[in-house]
């Protein structure tokens, strides 16, 4: 594969939206000795371009976490019709990864740093029997959950806070301050849907918050416990990290000046 030589006058920047099933991967990011979504995608894109292609993602999902709408950018001197980046790449990708859209954007765009908001959805099944058809694609608890108590706790997390109690010990962010703009919880019979929106997320932040909400939903702690965790800023006091199975990166928001499509997907509940 021919490595690219950087000259901004000959390079074009392409933005791609893609979906993937994270069950077979060690996460988004390339890592030695394991199969990642990023490595699969870059290999397929390089096949289309005939040159080495590298991508930058809006968010780095963990092992087992899925995406309904991940956003990446790439830079290349190879000219291809936008549809070729979609269909040509999909022809070289495994069935659990698919390019949805392709757009050309100005050189100063960055998939990660230009993003103003990210949205995650978590689908959680609450019933005695574990899921079969949706195994690995939906979270599960065998006990009932109190929707109202979880909603009360969720409201305490909205706003700008220090989320140290909900960050992984491996988190590399220099600050735990984040702006959580939305945390909606809805119930559809036995299925609970959690929607998290923030300017950015800490490592394991969504799954750690979810673990706390589930503790509150089953009656182990009152809703006010969430406020205490925020104040204490101590990860060891919070609930364990919840399963990745039902977690989906579902959208990334960018300023209108980039003239990009709306990268936000809400998957109907009957085709999770």
From Swiss-Prot:
MF annotations from Gene Ontology: RNA binding; tRNA pseudouridine(38-40) synthase activity
Top-level taxon of the source organism: Bacteria
GO biological process: tRNA pseudouridine synthesis
UniProt organism field: Nitrosomonas europaea (strain ATCC 19718 / CIP 103999 / KCTC 2705 / NBRC 14298)
Active-site residues, Swiss-Prot/TrEMBL: 62
Descriptive protein name: tRNA pseudouridine synthase A
Catalytic reactions on record: uridine(38/39/40) in tRNA = pseudouridine(38/39/40) in tRNA
Enzyme Commission number(s) from the entry: 5.4.99.12
Function: Formation of pseudouridine at positions 38, 39 and 40 in the anticodon stem and loop of transfer RNAs.
């Amino acid at each position: 594969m021919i490595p690219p030589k950087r000259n901004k006058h000959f390079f074009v920047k392409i933005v791609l939206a893609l979906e993937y099933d994270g069950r077979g991967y060690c996460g988004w990011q390339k890592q030695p000795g394991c199969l990642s979504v990023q490595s699969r995608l870059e290999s397929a894109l390089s096949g289309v371009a005939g040159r080495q292609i590298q991508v930058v993602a809006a968010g780095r999902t963990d092992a087992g976490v899925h995406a309904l709408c991940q956003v990446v950018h790439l830079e290349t001197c190879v000219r291809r019709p936008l549809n070729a980046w979609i269909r040509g790449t999909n022809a070289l990708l495994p069935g659990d990864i698919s390019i949805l859209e392709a757009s050309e954007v100005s050189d100063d765009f960055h998939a990660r740093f230009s993003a103003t908001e990210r949205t995650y959805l978590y689908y959680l099944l609450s019933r005695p029997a574990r899921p079969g058809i949706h195994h690995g694609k939906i979270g599960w608890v065998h006990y009932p959950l109190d929707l109202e108590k979880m909603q009360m706790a969720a409201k305490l997390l909205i706003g700008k806070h220090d989320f140290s109690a909900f960050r992984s010990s491996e988190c590399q962010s220099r600050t735990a301050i984040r702006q959580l703009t939305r945390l909606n919880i809805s119930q559809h019979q036995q299925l609970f849907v959690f929607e998290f929106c923030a300017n950015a997320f800490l490592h394991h932040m969504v799954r750690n918050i979810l673990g706390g909400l589930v503790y509150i939903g089953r009656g182990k702690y009152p809703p006010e416990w969430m406020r205490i965790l925020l104040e204490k800023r101590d990860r060891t006091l919070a609930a364990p990290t919840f399963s990745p199975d039902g977690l989906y990166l579902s959208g990334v928001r960018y300023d209108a000046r980039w003239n990009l499509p709306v990268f936000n997907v809400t998957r109907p509940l009957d085709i999770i």
